[in-house]
Amino acid sequence: MNKRIYLCLAHMSGKEQMYIKEAFDTNWVVPLGPNVNGFEKDLEEFVGEDKHVVALSAGTAAVHLALLACGVKPGDEVLVQSFTFCASSHPITYLGATPVFVDSEVDTWNMDPALLEEAIKDRIEKTGKTPKAIVPVALYGMPYKVDEIMAVADRYGIPVIEDAAEGFGSRYDGRMLGTFGKYGVLSFNGNKMITTSGGGALICPDGEAKREIMFYATCSTSIFRQSFQSL
C-alpha cells in the first residue's frame, strides 16, 4: 500500500483571506487585536467549564508558560509522556528542569497511570523531592486515562498540564480535553484540527491565571499587566 495517510489536512473555510485583509485594513498587524480577542472568547465558549483562554504563538509556548506558572525551576523534575512529539518535553529543559519520561499503556497509547505512580515514588525516594508537574498527552486526539491520572496527581498534590495539542474537540465523559488539569495546551499548527498556520493557546483555570500568562507572553511589561486588569 503506497497511499500516504496524513495526520490532518488543513481545511480552509473561505473566510481566512477576509479576516487577514481586515487585520491589515485596520492596522492590527501587531500580535494582539480584536480578532485575537474574539478568537479567545470563541475558544472559551467552546471548551466551557468557565475556563479562560490565552492565544499564544505556539502550543510549545503554551507548555512553556504553563510550566512557568506552576513554579518549575532549575533542578526540578517534570513527569511527561514518552510517546509524544518533542514539544511536550522541550519546554521543561528551557526552564532548567529535567523531564522524567513515563511509558504508555496499550489501550490509548498514552501515559500509563500505574507507571506514573511508580515514577513519582521512585523520584521521591531518590531525590527527596516531589516532581513539580505532570504532562499527559492526548496522542492523535485520543483521551488519556483521565480519571486514573488525575487520581494519582491528587494523591501527591502535583499539578497536571494537559497537552491536548492533538486533542482539540475531543471529549472525555462529555467534557473537553484540556479542561481537567490546572492548565490545558492547544495547538493550531497546520496539522491540527483547526489551524492558524502556526499558533496555540493555553486553557487557564481563572482570570487571575490568564492575566499571569498574558503578562509572561507579552515580555512581562507593566503596560500590558495594567491593560489586562479588566479582562
Enumerate the language-model features and the residues they cover:
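N-terminal "arm"/small-domain region of PLP-dependent enzymes with the aminotransferase-like
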Residues: M1-V30
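Structural motif of enzymes handling amino- and sulfur-group chemistry
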Residues: Q17-F24, E208-Y216, F224-L231
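Solvent-exposed, non-membrane alpha-helical residues enriched in polar/charged side chains
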Residues: K21, D25, E40-E44, H64, ...
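Phosphate-binding glycine-rich loop
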Residues: L32-E77, P91-T93, F101-D103, K126, ...
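Hydrophobic residues in well-ordered beta-strands that form the structural core
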Residues: P74, V80, F101, V160-E162, ...
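Conserved coil-to-alpha-helix start sites within the AMP-binding
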Residues: T84-S89
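Structured binding elements
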Residues: G96
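Active-site phosphate-binding strand-loop segment of PLP-dependent enzymes
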Residues: D107-T196, A201-A209
